[in-house]
Amino acid sequence: LLLSSSRPGTLPANLQGLWNDYVKPPWACDYHNNINVQMAYWGAEPANLSECHEALVNYVEAMAPGCRDASQANKGFNTKDGKPVRGWTVRTSQNIFGGNGWQWNIPGAAWYALHIWEHYAFTGDRKYLEKQAYPLMKEICHFWEDHLKELGAGGEGFKTNGKDPSEEEKKDLADVKAGTLVAPNGWSPEHGPREDGVMHDQQLIAELFSNTIKAARILGKDAAWAKSLEGKLKRLAGNKIGKEGNLQEWMIDRIPKTDHRHTSHLFAVFPGNQISKLKTPKLAEAARLSLEWRGTTGDSRRSWTWPWRTALWARLGEGNKAHEMVQGLLKFNTLPNMLTTHPPMQMDGNFGIVGGICEMLVQSHAGGLDIMPSPVEAWPEGSVKGLKARGNVTVDFSWKDGKVSNVKLYSAQPKVLPVRVNGKMTRMKTLPLKSGTESSPSAAR
């Protein structure tokens, strides 16, 4: 489906894609950038379809001038001294003509920047990084350099719904250090208060700054600026564990045991990589609890909620839970023709579940490769060929009795890589890339 709707030189896939059959389609068949259009491309790189990802990157580059004009015309984004903000961001709803619709999604451009970076991370295309990716990422960083808000000790200056926090709420801010940086007046899509330091925003900005710093150092550019950005990264308000052991969605510890469809505060688990079982086990356990709270009933039962939960459970090493999400999508939100339904019909579920399943099979976000990091009891044996890992490495492997039995790695240039297989670390040398290896992966049995 992605091959059919997203090629170099074309527009990216949108909500209903080429399969829209409405004169007035739901949500105008647009690009919703608070999850939907990004989800459509979660499988592009790991499923070895990098060329399909180019359509999204090129679209972001093409609409940047209009977004820049709109962002700089918005006086609400002005700097403290009244000057227009540098850089740009986006409104939630965009269309094929570059128009911006429903309300500002202030961290939306930062989410686009992750896709821009990931295309480099998987392909290793240095020319792309220098000429296209880095300039876009740097300008999006400029927006946040100008837009971030500095809090005083104990959260002085913090606002929730435009007002000072209550005395009870202030207790949750007591540990905030002077100089802490927060995204002002944010929103955890699509519920809760308008508030400073919403975790979804904080996580996106941290991902943006971190990846842009890496890009600058790879290219040997802007050393002083990258160092300054690193200083801001360290000052960002970070993830917090709440009173019940949950990963907080806001700096104020609300307990939203809700079936809300968005899992925005878990961005740091996936598609971000700030939280993992190996690097941050306490935060990972808190994220696990928060994911359990969201559940899979009511509002959580949507075409695109299942893929995100699939990927989240996979990143947390819970293969059987991830498999439950795959089955949930098929049972509750898939039409007889195999297209997914929100309802109504939307393509993001079809696209996104590919990315989720890829995360169950191979992960490469933590600095090495992890082969079948989330084994599934319902998949006792099987094989897959042609998956892609970061660093432009192609992966073939098979498994039997729930254990990986054979792994082959391919790359254009020989590499020795840290690889985790069946829970144990080893080092493997890549084989020469064979003709045809970079074709689309075969489905796992």
Language-model segments: residues:
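Gly/Pro-rich turn-and-neighbor structural signature
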Residues: 1-16, 30, 54, 221
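Extended, hydrophobic/aromatic-rich amphipathic alpha-helical segments that build helical scaffolds
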Residues: 1-5, 109-117, 135, 139-144, ...
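Short, solvent-exposed turn/loop segments enriched in Gly/Ser/Thr/Pro and often Arg
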Residues: 6-20, 60, 73-77, 186-187
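Long, K/E/R/D-enriched contiguous segments that form extended
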Residues: 9-37, 41-44
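Active-site core of glycosidic bond-cleaving carbohydrate-active enzymes
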Residues: 33-73, 77-83, 89-126, 131, ...
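Acidic/histidine-rich catalytic neighborhood
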Residues: 139, 143-215
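Surface beta-strand/loop "capping" patches
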Residues: 371-412
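C-terminal beta-sandwich/jelly-roll accessory domains of carbohydrate-active enzymes
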Residues: 401-445
